[in-house]
Curated annotation (Swiss-Prot):
Reported function: May be a positive catalyzer of strictosidine production by assisting secologanin biosynthesis, thus being involved in monoterpene indole alkaloids accumulation.
Species for this entry: Catharanthus roseus
The name this protein goes by in its record: CYP enzymes assisting alcohol dehydrogenase
Protein family (similarity comment): Belongs to the zinc-containing alcohol dehydrogenase family. Class-III subfamily.
Positions with a binding annotation for NAD(+): 45, 199-204, 223, 228, 294-296, 320, 371
Keywords of the record: Alkaloid metabolism, Metal-binding, NAD, Oxidoreductase, Zinc
Length: 376
C-alpha cells in the first residue's frame, strides 16, 4: 500500500473560502480502511466548518457526507474488504459498552463522536498537503470531500450496493438525522401523535418523512421559504406555516392555532438558530411535550425560557437522530430499497464537480436548493 496523491477540498483558515488542491493520503493503519469516495454532498454543517465549527482546527479537509468503495484495508480489519460499498460516518458502535447496551443512546463509549479533535482515534492524521507537507485535520474524522480518505473501520458502514449511490450520500448525515429522530428518539404513536418540524432542509424533510412512516396524521412544516411547501408536502407534510407571512404572531402561536390551542406532541428543531429553540419548545404540549433539537450552529450557548420548562416539557439534543451506525443505518438503506422510505431522490436539486465546490456553497443559498450532490 502506497501514499496516494489526490484532489481534496481544503479550508486553510476560518472564514477563508475552501480551495481544491492536491493532498497526500497515507495507507490505513491497523483497524483502518482507505476509501475511494464516489459521491459526496453538502450539508449546512460544512458551511459552519469553514467558520471553525465545532472547534477551530485548521487547515482541514472538509466534508462529512459521502459514499464510496473500500480501496484497501489495514491490519486486523475483517468486517470489510476491498470493493465493499461503504458510508463513512463520524460515529462508531462497538455493541458492547455501557452506552451501546443501554439502548438509550447512539453515542458509543469505545468509538466516540469524532467531532472535536480533527484527528483519527489514535490522535494523528492520515492527510497532509502535497505542497508543503503540513498536516491536515480531518473534519469529523472522515473528510469526504477528498478523492480518498482514511477512517477507522468501525466508522465505515457497509451498505447494500443496490441503492443509488447519490441517495446513499444523502443518508450519511442530514436526512437520516431527521428520519432517525422520529424513529429512535421521539417514540411517536401511530394515528395520535402530532408533530411540528421547524426548518425544511434535508434534516427537516427527513423528520417529515419519518413522521409519515410512523403513521403521524398531523405533520406541520415551518419554514420562511415558500418554495419548501411543495417539497414538504411531497414527503408527507399536512400543514405549512411561513412565519414571515404573519409577523403579528409567534411560531408557537401559529402552531397552537392548528392544534386546538394545545401544541404538538413533538417539535423537531432543525435550524440550529438559538432564537427559534424557545419557540420550538413552546410549540409543544404542556406536561407531555417533547422538543428534539437537530440543528447545529456556531454559538456556544443559548438562553432557554424557564417558563416553558415549568410546563414540564422535555428538551433533548440528538446527534445523527439517535441512529446507531452499524445496527440502524443498514436498516434505513433497506427501508429505501423496499420503498418504505419514499421520494428520497427528490432531495437532489443541484449537482457539481469537486472542482466547483465554491459554486456548491452559492447554490445552497438558492430558494429551491435542498441537497447539492458532489461528484468526485
Amino acid at each position: 500500500m502506497q501514499i496516494i496523491t489526490c484532489k481534496a477540498v481544503v479550508c486553510w483558515a476560518a472564514g477563508e473560502p475552501p480551495v481544491v488542491e492536491e493532498i497526500l493520503v497515507e495507507p490505513p493503519r491497523s483497524g483502518e480502511v482507505r476509501i475511494k469516495i464516489l459521491f459526496a454532498s453538502l450539508c449546512h454543517t460544512d458551511v459552519l466548518a469553514c467558520k471553525g465549527f465545532p472547534t477551530p482546527m485548521f487547515p482541514r479537509v472538509l466534508g462529512h457526507e459521502g459514499v464510496g468503495v473500500v480501496e484497501c484495508v489495514g491490519e486486523g480489519v475483517s468486517e470489510l474488504r476491498e470493493g465493499d460499498v461503504v458510508i463513512p460516518t463520524y460515529l462508531g458502535e462497538c455493541g458492547e459498552c455501557e452506552n451501546c447496551e443501554s439502548g438509550r443512546t447512539n453515542l458509543c463509549r469505545t468509538y466516540p463522536l469524532q467531532a472535536f479533535t480533527g484527528l483519527m482515534p489514535d490522535g494523528s492524521s492520515r492527510m497532509s498537503s502535497a505542497k508543503g507537507g503540513e498536516m491536515l485535520y480531518q473534519f469529523l474524522s472522515c473528510s469526504t470531500w477528498s478523492e480518498y480518505t482514511v477512517i477507522d473501520a468501525n466508522y465505515a458502514v457497509k451498505i447494500d450496493s443496490r441503492i443509488p449511490l447519490p441517495h446513499a450520500s444523502f443518508l450519511s448525515c442530514g436526512f437520516t438525522t431527521g428520519f432517525g429522530a422520529t424513529w429512535k428518539e421521539a417514540k411517536l404513536q401511530e394515528g395520535s401523535s402530532t408533530v411540528a418540524v421547524l426548518g425544511l432542509g434535508a434534516v427537516g424533510l427527513g423528520a417529515v418523512e419519518g413522521a409519515r412512516v410512523q403513521g403521524v396524521t398531523q405533520i406541520i412544516g415551518i419554514d420562511i421559504n415558500d418554495n419548501k411547501r411543495e417539497k414538504g408536502e411531497a414527503f408527507g407534510m399536512t400543514h405549512f406555516i411561513n412565519p414571515k407571512k404573519d409577523n403579528n404572531k409567534s411560531i408557537s402561536e401559529l402552531v397552537k392555532e392548528l392544534t386546538k390551542g394545545q401544541g404538538v406532541d413533538v417539535c423537531f428543531e432543525c435550524t440550529g438558530v438559538p432564537d427559534l429553540v424557545n419557540e420550538a419548545l413552546e410549540s409543544t404540549k404542556i406536561g407531555t411535550g417533547n422538543m428534539i433539537m437537530l440543528g447545529a450552529g456556531t454559538q456556544k450557548s443559548m438562553t432557554i425560557n424557564f417558563v416553558s420548562l415549568l410546563g414540564c416539557r422535555t428538551f433533548k439534543y440528538s446527534v445523527f437522530g439517535g441512529v446507531k451506525v452499524q445496527s440502524d443505518l443498514p436498516l434505513i438503506i433497506q427501508k429505501c430499497l423496499n420503498k418504505e422510505i419514499q421520494k428520497i431522490e427528490q432531495l437532489l436539486t443541484h449537482q457539481v464537480q469537486l472542482e466547483d465546490i465554491n459554486r456548491a456553497f452559492e447554490l445552497l443559498k438558492e430558494p429551491d436548493c435542498v441537497k447539492v450532490l458532489i461528484t468526485l
